[in-house]
């Protein structure tokens, strides 16, 4: 008796969305220099799903449809993995940005505890202290950009959270991290040349800063391990050094260095940029600003006190209306991937256009209107409000960043009067990876 032959079902035929005919080099340049403008123009012409061909990422499908974004974010990493290349070019192969599938899952489980729940409450006093220290230098009665101050605050906060104390080594990190992040952010959107043009070239400068960073890290790790109270320390470095994976193994020295660099860089620039936008926005909305001050004042003093519903809603709306990181990406692993009506072949990447979804009037009515009331008494959709990305690769530090922004805003509102302005909103400025207010989130303040 012959056996029946089971034929596996045929894969659906590839069906791609419309693609721009612009030259590949022009697409790459526009994507690197002005993604928001480019994506908005192409979405008007082709709709919420269209294809690009970028020098760095290759063939890409851009998705600005919330339901399709939800599908992408809820698809497992076996089908949709990490885009290549990624920010591991800046942070190293041991960074969470470099990892995929099970390696990525293991690392996130190890990193999550310091940045969630009760753990982040331990950092509130540090944030308030650093905010008061930095804002003591603010001028009164004259315009100044808040972004540099926010960069200082968020860098100092993450340094203290990671290492637990000060010292000469942290002063060295304060010296090298800001220019490293600024240059790295610009280069991240550009292909890396095959040839090394020396230590005075942009990529050579990044390599030199990395060499200096590794020397500092060796000293900090040695000092941490030698601390008689090492077992009781609560800083992130100590937690990493003591942590083990499920199989009992520990993070390597290189992986710890790469991961801490990721936290230092990604953990301060994006939060600082959002805070700069927050001051730019509230200074142009007098009624909102007055209500925020009343909320902060009525809450009483002390870092653990007080209601913050309006302040939280304002932070949510800043992240929607002035999205700092405007895309999240995945790479197709199976022979084909069905995305709505489209069938995407292996090797393609998919970019979720966060900014375009945040501007969608079907999801956020009158999206150009800055209105924190959207979130009073309700939570935004986890697949439409997506400043931290979504799914398995959502930012592991999202809760920490939200708490940090809340404490910084509350502290400033309690100690300063922010003058309102009817000046036009500041333009968007692309720093490579992040978007900041072009003039740095300028405000005028007076001490209360």
Please give the residue ranges for each predicted region:
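Conserved cytochrome P450 K-helix E-x-x-R motif and the immediately C-terminal K′/meander segment
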Residues: 28-47, 301-340, 361
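Cytochrome P450 catalytic-core helices
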Residues: 270-295, 399-414
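Conserved cytochrome P450 K-helix/beta-meander segment immediately N-terminal to the heme-binding cysteine loop
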Residues: 352-378
């Amino acid at each position: 008796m012959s056996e029946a032959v089971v034929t596996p079902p045929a894969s659906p035929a590839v069906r791609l969305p419309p693609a721009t005919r612009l030259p590949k080099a022009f697409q790459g340049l526009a994507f690197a220099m002005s993604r928001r403008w480019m994506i908005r123009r192409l979405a008007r012409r082709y709709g919420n799903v269209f294809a690009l061909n970028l020098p760095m990422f290759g063939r890409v499908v851009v998705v600005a449809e919330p339901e399709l974004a939800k599908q992408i974010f809820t698809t497992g990493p076996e089908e949709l993995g990490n885009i290549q290349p990624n920010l591991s070019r800046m942070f190293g192969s041991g960074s969470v940005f470099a990892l995929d599938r099970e390696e990525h899952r293991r690392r996130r489980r190890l990193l999550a505890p310091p940045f969630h729940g009760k753990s982040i409450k331990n950092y509130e006093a540090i944030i308030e202290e650093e905010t008061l220290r930095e804002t003591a230098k603010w001028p009164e009665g004259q315009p100044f950009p808040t972004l540099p101050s926010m960069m200082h605050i968020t860098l100092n906060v993450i340094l203290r959270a990671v290492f637990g104390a000060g010292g000469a080594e942290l002063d060295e990190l304060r010296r090298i991290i800001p220019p490293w992040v600024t240059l790295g952010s610009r280069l991240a959107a550009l292909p890396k040349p095959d040839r090394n043009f020396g230590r005075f070239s942009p990529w050579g400068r990044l390599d030199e800063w990395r060499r200096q960073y590794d020397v500092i890290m060796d000293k900090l790790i040695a000092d941490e391990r030698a601390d008689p109270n090492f077992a009781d320390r609560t800083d992130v470095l100590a937690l990493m050094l003591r942590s083990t994976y499920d199989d009992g193994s520990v993070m390597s020295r290189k992986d710890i260095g790469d991961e801490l660099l990721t936290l230092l860089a990604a953990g301060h620039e994006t939060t600082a940029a959002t805070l700069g936008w927050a001051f730019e926005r509230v200074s142009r909305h007098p009624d909102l600003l007055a209500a925020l001050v009343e909320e902060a004042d009525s809450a009483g003093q002390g870092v653990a006190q007080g209601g913050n519903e309006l302040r939280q809603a304002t932070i949510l709306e800043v992240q929607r209306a002035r999205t700092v990181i405007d895309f999240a990406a995945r790479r197709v692993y199976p022979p084909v991937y069905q995305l709505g009506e489209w069938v995407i072949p292996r090797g393609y990447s998919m970019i979720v256009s966060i900014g375009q979804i945040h501007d969608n009037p079907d999801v956020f009515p009158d999206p150009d209107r800055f209105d924190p009331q959207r979130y009073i008494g309700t939570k935004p959709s986890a697949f439409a409000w997506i400043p931290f990305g979504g799914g398995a690769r959502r930012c592991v530090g999202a809760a920490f960043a939200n708490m940090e922004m809340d404490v910084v805003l509350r502290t400033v509102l309690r100690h300063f009067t922010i003058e309102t302005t009817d000046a036009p909103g500041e333009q968007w400025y692309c720093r490579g990876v992040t978007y900041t207010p072009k003039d740095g989130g300028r405000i005028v303040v007076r001490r209360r």
